[in-house]
């Protein structure tokens, strides 16, 4: 009886989803499985990447980074932590969301 009550209780709980409602059309998502995943979202004008990326090495590339993410969806809600010179020219700034940066990179 206790198991049935527990199952009924668990079934009534809301399901949490960390997915973000976002149009990924025209974007390439890359992941390399390492201890922490290496993540890239590439758009037509540049890309955002995880903390593995050094924006100072992005010569003539518009790139920005976010930290502490494990999925592409988390990249969208994370705050941009570093920006290359070319990304700054597109209006991408430290502190904006990953989703805002991706839209400027489309």
What name fits each language-model region?
Residues 13-17:
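Sec/Tat signal peptide C-region and signal peptidase I cleavage site
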Residues 4-12:
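Sec-dependent N-terminal signal peptides
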Residues 18-106:
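Residues that scaffold, gate, or flank divalent-cation-dependent active/transport sites
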């Amino acid at each position: 009886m206790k198991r049935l009550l527990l199952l009924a209780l668990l079934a009534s709980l809301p399901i949490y989803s960390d997915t973000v409602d976002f149009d990924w059309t025209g974007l390439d998502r890359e992941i390399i499985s390492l201890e922490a995943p290496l993540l890239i979202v590439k758009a037509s004008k540049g890309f955002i990447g995880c903390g593995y990326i050094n924006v100072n090495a992005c010569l003539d590339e518009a790139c920005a980074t976010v930290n502490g993410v494990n999925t592409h969806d988390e990249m969208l809600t994370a705050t941009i932590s570093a920006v290359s010179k070319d990304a700054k020219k597109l209006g991408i700034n430290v502190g904006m969301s990953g989703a805002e940066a991706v839209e400027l990179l489309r």
